Amino acid sequence: MRVFLRFKLYSGILFSILTSSPIMGQSEYKIFGHRGCRGVYPENTIEGFKKAIEFGVDGIELDVVVNKNQELVISHESYIDTSYCLTNKIDNESLNIYKMNISEIQDIDCGSKFVKEFPNQLKVKEKKPTYKEFKKELIDYQGDILFEIKCDYDLVNEYFPDYEKYAKIIFEETRFSRHFDNIYFMSFDYRILNELFKIMPNSKYIYLSSNKEFEKQMKLLNFEPFGVGIDFNIISQKIIDLVHNKKQVIYGWTINDEENSKSLTSMGLDGVITDYPNIIKK
């Protein structure tokens, strides 16, 4: 009997030590391919998303803007960025996606140009896809989608639709999608999240910030979001604990080296958003 009690005592102590350690006690985290996997393939493209999925990501991150025909276009910028797209035009005004139809947008090659930031990125002719094309090409995809909505209050009606119209476009293009339940709507602009929440109160929302004062910014939201996405450079144990105490998740962007990934996930970071899902592994 004494042996059995002693065994139970030792087992309990061992279990307590193991589960209280930073690594054994942390919850499972997720890895997301940033704009697909732009470290190795042109960003925000159908093939880029497929490559990220091949690398085994838990989810993919993409960005959306709106074109002249009120369609969602997958693009990080609201204009054709000449730093990675091939065009003779140099002014953003003439390359404003909000004033271009889809054929004009997709006539421009956004994959063949050398990108200094990503020297190993495959150079191949690519186009900016619509969200409708994404839904069709990845219809069987069942992972998470970090759906970043690009917006800027100072550029509304010039580069972006007004918030109410923007929210309705997003609602119409996503609500019947097979991916809908896996979408996390994200933005740096609290206004578009508030507008979306009015018509999709049961969806998941993530507030994005690159500011340590993100808590103050979040007070402008009319609801409690599912979580926050923060520049990894300002994430600390204190910030992770603060977010977790609110029963929210915290994702870090953009983490491209294993050292930072391991360090932050050992603190309890819930998600790693990376350009290199071929390198950053669990």
Predicted features along the sequence, with ranges:
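Phosphate-group recognition and catalysis centered on beta-loop-alpha active-site segments
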Residues: 22-282
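Bacterial Sec-dependent N-terminal signal peptides
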Residues: 1-28
